[in-house]
């Protein structure tokens, strides 16, 4: 479980454009075990590779009207660990659209 470079696409519908940015995020493997065979009544907590700390960076999205805030702030991981996925701040599913999805025109 470690920091890795990733390209993500930021989208602001009011501006009609998407922008690709480089960032760091956490990826990799965490130790897991399945005790169901030996102890079916005991459930194990499985760790996932997630961030310990993030900072926020801001980019200006082009093509925004004058009455629209053109700035978009996004998280960038600065440290990773194996732990519980916090569904309050993270999409813990595997059904996300992916970091390069854009429903608008891309710059």
Curated annotation (Swiss-Prot):
GO cellular component: cytoplasm; extracellular space; follicle-stimulating hormone complex
Glycan attachment points: 5, 22
Gene3D superfamilies documented for this protein: Cystine-knot cytokines
GO molecular function, one term: follicle-stimulating hormone activity
Subcellular location(s) per record: Secreted
Domain of life of the native organism: Eukaryota
SUPFAM superfamilies: Cystine-knot cytokines
Main location: secreted
Single Gene Ontology BP annotation: regulation of signaling receptor activity
Residue pairs linked by disulfide bridges in the UniProt entry: 1-49, 15-64, 18-102, 26-80, 30-82, 85-92
Pfam families: Cys_knot
Keywords: Disulfide bond, Glycoprotein, Hormone, Secreted
InterPro entries in the record: Cystine-knot_cytokine (IPR029034), Glyco_hormone_CN (IPR006208), Gonadotropin_bsu (IPR001545), Gonadotropin_bsu_CS (IPR018245)
Record-linked PANTHER family: FOLLITROPIN SUBUNIT BETA, GLYCOPROTEIN HORMONE BETA CHAIN
Function: Together with the alpha chain CGA constitutes follitropin, the follicle-stimulating hormone, and provides its biological specificity to the hormone heterodimer. Binds FSHR, a G protein-coupled receptor, on target cells to activate downstream signaling pathways. Follitropin is involved in follicle development and spermatogenesis in reproductive organs.
Similarity comment: Belongs to the glycoprotein hormones subunit beta family.
Subunit field text: Heterodimer. The active follitropin is a heterodimer composed of an alpha chain/CGA shared with other hormones and a unique beta chain/FSHB shown here.
Protein's recorded name: Follitropin subunit beta
The gene coding this protein: fshb
């Amino acid at each position: 479980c470690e920091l890795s470079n990733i390209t993500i696409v930021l989208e602001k519908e009011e501006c009609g454009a998407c922008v690709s940015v480089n960032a760091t995020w956490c990826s990799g493997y965490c130790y897991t075990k399945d005790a169901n065979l030996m102890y079916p009544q005991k459930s194990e907590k499985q760790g996932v590779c997630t961030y310990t700390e993030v900072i926020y960076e801001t980019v200006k999205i082009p093509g925004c009207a004058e009455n629209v805030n053109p700035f978009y702030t996004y998280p960038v991981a600065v440290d990773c660990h194996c732990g519980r996925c916090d569904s309050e701040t993270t999409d813990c599913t595997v059904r996300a659209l992916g970091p390069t999805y854009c429903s608008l025109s891309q710059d």
